[in-house]
Amino acid sequence: VTQLSLQAARPTLALDVPTGVNATTGEVSTPAIRACTTLMLDLPKRGVLELGARHHTGELFLADIGIPRSVHERLGVSIPGVFSEGPIVRLRR
């Protein structure tokens, strides 16, 4: 599927993290998808925000998928007000 996507001359939407990009480190393996847009789910993924991954992530959005705030609090994660403007937030153009 990755090879077909790379050969297609069409825009690609990555869901959460583009295939081939490490969500934690941002390391890019071969082959890797070059998405025109990436829609991350629930929380930003550190690796997607790394400089080395930028050529593969395109425009970045974050989507609220309904995970309760209490779950984030139990994990020690705080993202106050990130979805105050709506369920999908643009992070980078």
Where are these regions (language model features)?
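YjeF_N-associated NAD(P)HX repair module
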Residues: 1-93
